[in-house]
Amino acid sequence: SEIPQPSLDFEQFSNMIQCTIPPGEECLAY
């Protein structure tokens, strides 16, 4: 399993997950 973004921090990942549940188009815009 290769990681596309090794610099992906858990904070960003957690933020993306939380922004994926609600209509977080602005969140995914980063």
Swiss-Prot record:
One of its GO terms (cellular component) is extracellular region. It is found in: Secreted. Keywords: Disulfide bond, Glycoprotein, Secreted. Heterotrimer: Snake venom phospholipase A2 (PLA2) heterotrimer that acts as a potent presynaptic neurotoxin by blocking synaptic transmission and synaptic vesicle recycling. Enzymatic activity is essential for the neurotoxic effects. May act by binding in a calcium-dependent fashion to neurotonal pentraxin-1 (NPTX1) and neurotonal pentraxin-2 (NPTX2), but not to neuronal pentraxin receptor (NPTXR). Also binds to taipoxin-associated calcium binding protein 49 (RCN2), a protein localized in the lumen of endoplasmic reticulum. Glycosylated. This is Acidic phospholipase A2 homolog cannitoxin gamma chain. The lineage of its organism: Eukaryota, Metazoa, Chordata, Craniata, Vertebrata. Its main location: secreted. The keyword Nuclease does not apply. It comes from the Eukaryota. Expressed by the venom gland. Heterotrimer of alpha, beta, and gamma chains; non-covalently linked. The keyword Metal-binding does not apply. Belongs to the phospholipase A2 family. Group I subfamily. D49 sub-subfamily.
